[in-house]
Amino acid sequence: VSARVALVTGGSRGVGRGVATALADAGWTVYVTGRSAERLRGTVEAADGAPGQVRPLECDHGRDDEIVAVVARIVADTGRLDLLVNNVWTNPKGFMGFNGKFWERPAGDWDALLGVGLRAHYVACCEAAKVMVPQGSGLMVNISSFGSRAPFHTVLYGMSKTALDKMASDMAHELAGTGVSTLSLWLGLIRTELILSLGMDDFNGFPLDRAEDPTFVGRVIAALAEDPSLPGLSGSTIITAEYGREKGLRNDDGEVPLSHRGAFGGGPLFPPVADQQLGIATVDEVAEAGGHNGFAGG
């Protein structure tokens, strides 16, 4: 068993599969979750021959108890957990390709996009922290996107991504001094099998030959986990293409992916916790000054 153990949720295809195989290439023991045993086997096969290994675990991330059981199984097998990659996501029926307004979509989209795409990540972080904090080390990564800042897909999609960034930021405050770090990653356009199968040279004007491979995202995460400056980055949102360029990382074909920063209105909303100057006064300090604490209802 490798000394480094990772959990990649939603690892049966796409970004999750790419991250898992890249981590295995870097020597990690990687547990991947998904609802389809057959698709999970595909991820295991994709990592065949790598220095590390991929171990599949079936999990319905809409159920808290199954997430808890996954982390417990990993600890029972290996005694530790060094990396959590929150990638699992549910695509509501008719969501992909939908160009209408938010009020034209079913309200039930909330349960998929924020239930699995947000709640499941929170539950996984809670369980991972119970392992990482006592061992004094670890990294928790949320897979986010530029949809956190710019209108993208639907209102609920953007809400879920902004919440993931804020989650990483606030968790970093509470994890300060424990040796555990949290990050949120803004991925660009990803060259998944679905995108490549369309046979296009560009996607909404963005050249596919400079988009990101799923494995590129995995290389970025592997580099972050080994980065000596990681504690100083904790709580921040990082653009994968920009970090990858800085570290000399490339796609499978050797190309360097482009950042989407200019196309979507700028950079991340949350800097590292170490750079944040909160300056929040206590309730007693506000009362003594005769002021209002600024919080609704306060």
Feature names for model-found ranges:
Residues 99-111, 115:
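Short, well-ordered secondary-structure patches that form non-catalytic structural/interaction elements
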Residues 184, 204-281:
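C-terminal helical subdomain
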